[in-house]
Amino acid sequence: MEKNCYELQYPRDNLYLSCYVNESLNYRYHWHPAEYEFQIVLCGKQEFCRGKENFVMEEDDIVLVEPNAGHASFSTTLNTRTLVIRFSALAFKPFLKKGESFSFSGFPSGQKTRKGPRYTRIRFYAARLLDAASQASPYAPLAARGSAQLLLDP
């Protein structure tokens, strides 16, 4: 599978993003020191490990991984694809007191929650972000930034 990775930078807001569609294959444990990561299962099924948690993710499920949290996944069905969006933790710095960190709650989604309004909204803005990032239009960076900011609204 060809992987197009889109990198977006908004230095005035300390917002640095990357997004791509990934084929979930093998178990590769890793972490990101200064980035959050959303993973949205587009199709298929995968097992996901985040820290000491293990869970199964199905189509439309979303997980968020905080900075420095070890994580890995592997496909349990053929052709499992995920949308991965990583964004800088520094984007929240203006909103936090010294020594605080930003924390999202309610992740991962699951069978009872994946179709709820919060997760539907996240999938919508994530799709808009990927679409805008892939466009050559001079206005695409503006659309991508707006989608990213709405995506990050906890």
Question: Could you tell me what each predicted segment is?
Answer:
Residues 2-17, 70-135, 153-154:
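A hydrophobic/aromatic-rich effector-binding and dimerization subdomain
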Residues 1-58, 101-103:
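Generic protein-terminus/edge-of-domain signal
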Residues 57-70:
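Conserved metal-binding segment of the jelly-roll/cupin
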Residues 37-40, 121-128, 147:
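Amphipathic, well-ordered alpha-helical segments in soluble domains
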Residues 39, 63, 83:
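Conserved GNAT-family N-acetyltransferase fold
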Residues 133-150:
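All-alpha amphipathic helical-bundle segments outside canonical DNA-binding/catalytic cores
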